[in-house]
Amino acid sequence: MSPLSARSPRETVAFSAQRFPDHEALHIPLQACADFSPQPVSLTYRELDRAINEVTTLWQGTGIAGRVALVCENRAEFLIHWLALNALGLSVIPINHEMPDQEIPYYLEHGEAVAVCTLAKHLERFTDICSSNELDIPVVSCDSISSLNLGKPIEQPAPDPDAECALLYTSGSTGKPKGCILSNDYFLEQGHWYRAQGGHIELRDGRERLLTPLPLSHMNAMSVSTMAMFSTGGCLIQLDRFHPATWWQSVRESEATALHYLGVLPAILLALPESDGDDFSGQIRFGFGAGVNPAHHERFERRFGFPLVEAWAMTECGAGGAIIASHEPRHVGTCCFGRPGKPIEWQLVDENKKPVAKGMPGELRVRARGPNPKKGYFSGYLKNPEATEEAWLGGWLNTGDVVQELPDGNLIFVDRRKNIIRRSGENISALEVEAAVSDHQDIQMAVATAVPDELRGDEVALCVILKADTVDPKTTAESIQAHVLEKLAYFKAPAWVIFSSSLPVTASNKPKRADVKTLALKAIEEEGAIDLRHLKKRTKSV
């Protein structure tokens, strides 16, 4: 048997349990589990397989039929209950426990959850949420599944690659989050894709130990990390979250050979004091992620001794449209994410969906090559056929990401189309502005957004969290603008600067850009923003 013949994530684990029964499948370092375990959590493939079988039997006896919401953090319980339900042909709705109470009912109602399975410490909270919102949904803890009685025991069906495996919600810039229906095949293709890349991210069967701090409630950790390891007999090293102070300790003690990251991680790690133990070239083979600040990329690799391999993907495209710079040249420091592989058809288009001239930026559209252009992609948005049709307008997945092709065929990320600031006919990337101010001595975090301007159409507003309060906001704002002008053309500099003690972010610490824009507009309206428009002059270009 081979993972390549698996028909579901559960079957993938079963196959690896036969090939590598005594290899470690899951490891949670002590730094990530100290509040519930006196020692690191460790499960071999044999132990994980047995635990899944035991929990599958418990769920069978409940008579469950429908989606189950999982509130299990980045714990072994998440994987065990997800895969047990997967064995029964049932889907899960991962819920981030850090989500505010008022947001949770939407996910339970829209996703039509028939039960909530949670860690014991969240049981009372989620019971109260369901009760106060008049949701007739039973809530059980992971260790009391047998108390649930929803009908006659159910049969275990044969695995179906096309069956729904999970419902993951993606937050859009407007409106409610959309539920992405992800099939078993979606997850299987993630493992196949990772195994096929080679180059810097080549996976060695039974030998890799992949560390990730990302939440299992998101696509990267739930589908990419898990399937990469489970399909190769590797070990998933799952942190509860990113802990800068103990990050390298976790890396060393867990004997990680690879790691996954978000763009903010390298910046934070580079800010830590240098030490004699910074060189990980003898241990870590690669980092896999997206969004590293171009100014940090080469510095990070030189200091820590391993490549940060940039990739592009989105929940909707899965592995079907994923692209990664796993082979040279990687064009370090340019936001390059590689050359599309042969299984992918792609094009760059303008706002009218017409192909742009070679070398010009345009929206990336992707689809699978062959008879099924949606192979490896999401199955659609739950209860939203209009949005699904819009996503696949013209027979392509319209990603909304603005990308540029280099002469050698590699692609570089410019920005999300909705993050492009259009000022007097110039297209300005919010990410480019943010990168330009990231090393300003006073800035902890900065997010750029477009605000309306009667003369220019859009102007650049920059919302900033300072490392310490300033006694002279105007001078500090001017210093920030001057810092940008040293690096970018004058029209890209912030016209408005808004200081705030906090900015809205997602669970993975990405800015909630729609909320940031609302904050900026309100600050300007209420005269709480610093107006620097008069200082934007055509005196210098870079």
Which residues are covered by each model-predicted region?
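Conserved C-terminal "lid"/linker of ANL adenylate-forming enzymes
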Residues: 421, 447-453, 461-465, 481-542
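Conserved AMP-binding/adenylation subdomain of ANL enzymes
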Residues: 188-209, 217-258, 272
